[in-house]
Amino acid sequence: MSSLGGGSQDAGGSSSSSNTNSSSGSGQKAGGTDKSTAVAATTAPTSVADDAPPPERRNKSGIISEPLNKSLRRSRPLSHYSSFGSSGGGGSMMGVESADKAAAAAASLLANGHDLAAAMAVDKSNPTSKHKSGAVASLLSKAERATELAAEGQLTLQQFAQSTEMLKRVVQEHLPLMSEAGAGLPDMEAVAGAEALNGQSDFPYLGAFPINPGLFIMTPAGVFLAESALHMAGLAEYPMQGELASAISSGKKKRKRCGMCAPCRRRINCEQCSSCRNRKTGHQICKFRKCEELKKKPSAALEKVMLPSGAAFRWFQ
């Protein structure tokens, strides 16, 4: 009986010990589950907070203000990261400090005009400054493009100024001197010359420059500048006289004067020599044996063109 009682006691002790062990094991398991649920409870708000959509941003009028860029629509304001970092502990505070340092470095790089690679290298260490690095990159690219456009515009203006200066020099070389032109010209021709110098011509492409359109010979082969036309049109050393202009504008095809030889370019009518006496008559002044211009082109047809200033102009084709 004693052995049976001891066996029962041993069985009861083992059962009690097993019960206590099982209860303690269950208590440890329960404690482990409680800890795991607590950890999950602590990590769940952070994941929910990260996955939750950003709050709607509204201005003072209550209108929702969303960024135009699609990649920035899910971005959060800086206050979200600062509040999350302050509740997270020392590591998050270090992250906020590094974010502030990265933002300050990016601003300094933008102000000093450094390269984009340096700004991206500073921003790679912090994931929260990706949007800032993108904004810095876009601003730097826009600034570089603006400087390139400004440089191209300056180069174009310089080339235009150089071409304009060269054209002005050519015009000044072919224009008559005012002292020589005003000595023997009649009043009407002097006024016409002043209008041709100071006013604009009827040609739209030559309106900005005082170029007489009579200097250009238009032929089927092209447009040429006549050297002898400078003398005959009165734009060179020996200008034409009023009588010659009236004689040419009468419509006669007979050649009266060449404008190149000494009798033709004589300004004052002496009324003694045959050349001066025949100026106002229908006789021919230039002779083939005296005038080199008529020897070169004896059968050339005489043509007449009315200039915008009112004076007649002729040249030999």
Curated annotation (Swiss-Prot):
One of its GO terms (biological process) is negative regulation of transcription by RNA polymerase II. Zn(2+) 1 binds at C258, C261, C264, C291. GO terms for cellular component: cytosol; nucleoplasm. Its main location: nucleus. Residues 1-10 have a biased composition (Gly residues). Keywords: Cytoplasm, DNA-binding, Metal-binding, Nucleus, Zinc, Zinc-finger. Pfam families: zf-CXXC. Residues 1-92 are annotated as: Disordered. A zinc finger (CXXC-type) spans 251-292. Residues 11-27, 36-51 have a biased composition (Low complexity). GO terms for molecular function: DNA-binding transcription factor binding; methyl-CpG binding; sequence-specific DNA binding; zinc ion binding. InterPro entries: CXXC4/CXXC5, Znf_CXXC. A motif (Nuclear localization signal) lies at residues 252-257. It comes from the Eukaryota. It is found in: Nucleus; Cytoplasm. The keyword tRNA-binding does not apply. May indirectly participate in activation of the NF-kappa-B and MAPK pathways. Acts as a mediator of BMP4-mediated modulation of canonical Wnt signaling activity in neural stem cells. Required for DNA damage-induced ATM phosphorylation, p53 activation and cell cycle arrest. Involved in myelopoiesis. Binds to the oxygen responsive element of COX4I2 and represses its transcription under hypoxia conditions (4% oxygen), as well as normoxia conditions (20% oxygen). May repress COX4I2 transactivation induced by CHCHD2 and RBPJ. PANTHER family: CXXC-TYPE ZINC FINGER PROTEIN 5, ZINC FINGER-CONTAINING. The CXXC zinc finger mediates binding to CpG-DNA. Interacts with DVL1. Interacts with RBPJ. This is CXXC-type zinc finger protein 5. It comes from Mus musculus (Mouse).
